[in-house]
């Protein structure tokens, strides 16, 4: 059976695992680098991106993930971690050829929900935006999947999927299922 890991350093790990299981696959909380060898794909959850990067450094995840050819899906802070560039600083894992701007929809009090049309998935996906980034620039090879108010909020490139919002905070698991069935199983 296909096994999907969720990096369990911070964020809504249980909620992501629930979406994996609702999609019909096994979800595993990844707490140790060695576990990366046991999975077919990895979800990088939201949270605080600076903290996430520090924890990934501390536990040795950065080096291993840069070396691995593993399909990855980043949500919110996970998107920032996958990006090659983050507004005036270099990226972290450098997997998606994009530039991300942090907190571009405002602070926590400015959080909102929006119905999204996500190319290839559905035209009625509920997006929960909490201190969300947006994708300011995409390079060649990156496919734009969705925008909100003219800002890019979902992209894919090869085996990498990135979204600005939190799909795991809704009951709609279609994005997770898409990641597994179109970017891992293909």
From Swiss-Prot:
| Gene Ontology biological process | glutamine catabolic process; pyridoxal phosphate biosynthetic process; pyridoxine metabolic process
Q: Name one GO cellular component term.
A: cytosol
Pathway it works in = Cofactor biosynthesis; pyridoxal 5'-phosphate biosynthesis
The Swiss-Prot or TrEMBL record annotates one GO molecular function as:
glutaminase activity
* A Pfam family the protein falls into: SNO
Q: Which UniProt keywords apply?
A: Glutamine amidotransferase, Hydrolase, Lyase, Pyridoxal phosphate
Q: Which reaction does it catalyse?
A: aldehydo-D-ribose 5-phosphate + D-glyceraldehyde 3-phosphate + L-glutamine = pyridoxal 5'-phosphate + L-glutamate + phosphate + 3 H2O + H(+); L-glutamine + H2O = L-glutamate + NH4(+)
CDD domains named in the record: GATase1_PB
Which positions are annotated as binding L-glutamine?
47-49, 102, 130-131
Q: Which residues form the active site?
A: 76 (nucleophile), 166 (charge relay system), 168 (charge relay system)
The record's EC number reads: 4.3.3.6, 3.5.1.2
> What is known about its subunit structure?
In the presence of PdxS, forms a dodecamer of heterodimers. Only shows activity in the heterodimer.
User: What NCBIfam families does the record point to?
Assistant: PLP_synth_Pdx2 (TIGR03800)
Q: What does this protein do?
A: Catalyzes the hydrolysis of glutamine to glutamate and ammonia as part of the biosynthesis of pyridoxal 5'-phosphate. The resulting ammonia molecule is channeled to the active site of PdxS.
Give the family per the record. Belongs to the glutaminase PdxT/SNO family.
- Spell out the protein name for this chain: Pyridoxal 5'-phosphate synthase subunit PdxT
Question: Lineage, please?
Answer: Bacteria, Bacillati, Bacillota, Bacilli, Bacillales
């Amino acid at each position: 059976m296909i096994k999907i890991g969720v990096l369990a350093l911070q964020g809504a790990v249980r909620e992501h695992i629930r979406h994996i299981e609702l999609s019909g696959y096994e979800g595993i909380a990844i707490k140790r680098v060695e576990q990366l060898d046991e999975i077919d794909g990895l979800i990088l959850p939201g949270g605080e991106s600076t903290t996430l990067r520090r924890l990934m450094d501390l536990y040795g995840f950065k080096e291993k993930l840069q070396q691995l050819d593993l399909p990855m899906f980043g949500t919110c802070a996970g998107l920032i971690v996958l990006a090659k560039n983050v507004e005036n600083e270099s990226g972290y894992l450098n997997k998606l050829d994009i530039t991300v701007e942090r907190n571009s929809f405002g602070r926590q009090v400015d959080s909102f929900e929006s119905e999204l049309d996500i190319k290839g998935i559905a035209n009625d996906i509920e997006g929960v935006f909490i201190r969300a980034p947006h994708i300011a620039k995409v390079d060649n090879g990156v496919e734009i999947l969705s925008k909100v108010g003219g800002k890019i909020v979902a992209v894919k490139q090869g085996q990498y999927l990135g979204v600005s919002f939190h799909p795991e905070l809704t009951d709609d698991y279609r994005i997770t299922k898409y990641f597994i069935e179109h970017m891992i199983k293909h």
